[in-house]
Swiss-Prot record:
The keyword Methyltransferase does not apply. InterPro entries: MYC/MYB_N. Belongs to the bHLH protein family. It comes from the Eukaryota. Non-functional truncated transcription activator. Corresponds to one of the seven genes studied by Gregor Mendel in 1866. The wild type purple flowers (A allele) have a functional BHLH protein (AC E3SXU4). This is Truncated basic helix-loop-helix protein A. The keyword Coiled coil does not apply. Keywords: Activator, Flavonoid biosynthesis, Transcription, Transcription regulation. Residues 241-264 have a biased composition (Acidic residues). It comes from Pisum sativum (Garden pea).
């Protein structure tokens, strides 16, 4: 699998620069990107949209103005690289369609010389925009001194009057024109939209499992304590028909014993019904809670569950269904099978209800 080539990213960036500058009909657009090694803003890419003095091409047919501007931007970059390499390397034969310095207008020279500039954060228009994370709008760039605008001399020669630097997610977009334009916030939003729309927005912050901001309100921190009212229709009372079928399958040969068990079960069921009716006024489990829990309201967002509030259901963490059942009040029917050693059943004659003690 081949790795993505840098040209793909450069083409995408240049397309955004082209769309932005052509939408407002300004002279040029640049992108200053941060250099990780030196932590300074350097030329990333650009698009020239201004006047052209001499057009050179090897294409036999006439091209559109958009294609000509794109080709011009590439030729200007190649000319700068050629001039930079010529200082250390012997001159090489260049294609006949390559530009020469005498082929450029003053605005093209301004655009070409921008490639050689760099700006530490906080220095120059791009550096200030990057450090402050706010746009910088300079009207009269050709009239100020070099302390205000380091490229003021070049701007005066090229008649660049307005320069705007707009910080984006990973750099600064600079856009300039030969017209004098006053600051316009809608213009800033318009230009920035070409670059923000091509970046995925960061996800909304979510509470981590270590967050101290109301952890019970996070979906990852649903309290393990649940209180429900036992529904008489859903309580576990042995069904007489099911018991009869089980007894017939298990003891088909012993009809006398099965009949006696049926009578016994009917007696127990009648006794359980009377117990249920006696315990009807009190369906909720009464739990003694500390005062700090009682003070907290269910809607005040407080987390008073950190107090000494212990329930027996802690031992049932391995079985979630049993853990929930431990906080519900259920009515138990007769227990026909012998109890194991881990359970003890006590019958209170005062309230006629069963309690299971683990």
């Amino acid at each position: 699998m081949t790795a993505p080539t840098p040209e793909n990213g450069c083409n995408k960036l240049q397309n955004m620069l082209q769309a932005a500058v052509q939408s407002v009909q300004w002279t040029y657009s640049l992108f200053w990107q941060i250099c990780p090694q030196q932590l300074i803003l350097v030329w990333g890419d650009g698009y020239y949209n201004g006047a052209i003095k001499t057009r050179k091409t090897v294409q036999p047919m006439e091209v559109s103005a958009e294609e000509a501007s794109l080709q011009r931007s590439q030729q200007l970059r190649e000319l700068y690289e050629s001039l930079s390499a010529g200082e250390t390397n012997p001159p090489t034969r260049r294609p006949c369609a390559s530009l020469s310095p005498e082929d450029l207008t003053e605005s093209e020279w301004f655009y070409l010389m921008c490639v050689s500039f760099s700006f530490p954060p906080g220095v120059g228009l791009p550096g200030k925009a990057y450090a402050r994370r706010q746009h910088v709008w300079l009207t009269g760039a050709n009239e100020v001194d070099s302390k205000t605008f380091s490229r003021a001399i070049l701007a005066k020669s090229a008649n660049i009057q307005t320069v705007v630097c707009i910080p984006v997610l990973d750099g600064v977009v600079e856009i300039g024109t030969t017209d004098k334009v006053q600051e316009d916030l809608n213009f800033i939003k318009h230009v920035r939209s070409f670059f923000i729309d091509h970046h995925s927005l960061p996800p909304k912050p979510a509470l981590s499992e270590h967050s101290t901001s109301n952890p019970t309100y996070s979906t990852d921190h649903i309290p393990a304590i649940m209180y429900t009212v036992a529904d008489p229709a859903s309580t576990t009372i042995p069904n007489q028909d099911d018991m009869d079928e089980d007894e017939e399958e298990d003891d088909e040969d012993d009809e006398v014993e099965s009949g006696s068990e049926d009578e016994t079960n009917q007696g127990h069921n009648q006794h359980a019904t009377s117990i249920i009716e006696a315990a009807e006024p009190s369906e909720l489990m009464q739990i003694e809670m500390p005062d700090d829990i009682r003070i907290g309201s269910p809607n005040d967002g407080s987390n008073n569950l950190d107090s000494d509030f212990h329930l027996l259901a802690v031992s049932n963490q391995g079985n979630p269904s049993r853990q929930i059942d431990s906080y519900t009040t259920e009515r138990w029917g007769p227990i026909e099978e012998p109890l194991d050693d881990s359970l003890q059943v006590q019958l209170s004659s005062s309230d006629k209800s069963y309690f299971i003690i683990h």
